[in-house]
Amino acid sequence: MKTEALFETTAKPVEMKRSDWLLGVIGILKPRETSLLVFIGFCSAVVAGGGHPEVGNLGLALVAITLGSAGANGLTNYLDRRVDGRMQRTIRRALPSGLVKPPEKVLPLILALLIAGLALAWLLHPLAFVAGLVGTIAAVIARKTWATHILGGVSGAAPVAVGWLAIDHSPGLPLLLLALLIMVWVPIHVWSLMMAYREDYLKAGVNMFPVTRPVSQSIKVFPVLSAALYGLSIGLWQAAGFGWFYFALANVLGLAVFLASLRLLKTGVNRDAWRVYKLSAYPYLGLIFLAMCIDLWL
């Protein structure tokens, strides 16, 4: 009887701490990625305001971008949960690991964030709402088409558009170039990650470029995209009227990404794909948007 009682006691599953569950929910919203999107949205608003945007609209725009970006990131996490569960890199995420279950539990929160973000965007300006809505739709349908990462670029450009249109209601060439910068940046960033974990993606059954092509072919796209990214950043210097500070940093960052892409083209190894991925994240995107603001404040 004692042995049986002991067995019953030790066999009970350990209850999940509420704090672990809460951290899991926060993780689904991808706070690091969301913070980067909010930051570039903030910088876009600063540029639209000539360095000094109206504080009330800026604050409302930041709340809208935060809510919308968190909701969109949560939605992509939810839609990708099955693929994430088949990959070593992502299997420990909250949804595939079962930390938050059933997965549908997070949908009300995700939808509430998206609706709240879009509602605030509408209060700012109808064009800001349209930008947020297009970004949300692109995030949803991206998983169902070959143009996944092109639509991902559209979704990624939404915070920039919302931030700009919250301050300046007349979109022009600078906003177009900012959006194009993001749309070119997204495939560099995402595809380099996929190349770094190519075998993991293939084992998970991900049938899309670049992992479906031979490495020697797929890596050729990186110098081309990096050159386009570099060109867009310099075009933005002209269109937005930035000064020497932005010009200098845009050249340094653009060359860094381009040279890293050339190295990947030369070696074709996972390590160099990972370097392109890491360099293109906060070091490139964060710094080049920060340079725009500093240039206007100097």
Predicted regions, residues:
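Cytosolic, membrane-interface loops and tails of multi-pass inner-membrane proteins
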Residues: 4-22, 78-100, 191-219
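Transmembrane alpha-helical segments that form the membrane-embedded catalytic/substrate-channel core
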Residues: 66-75, 137-141, 179-198, 252-264
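Multi-pass membrane catalytic core of lipid/isoprenoid biosynthesis enzymes
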Residues: 81, 85-127, 214-238
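Intramembrane alpha-helical segments
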Residues: 99-169
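Hydrophobic alpha-helical transmembrane segments in multi-pass integral membrane proteins
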Residues: 161-174, 229-236, 284-298
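Interfacial loop-to-transmembrane junctions
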Residues: 258-288
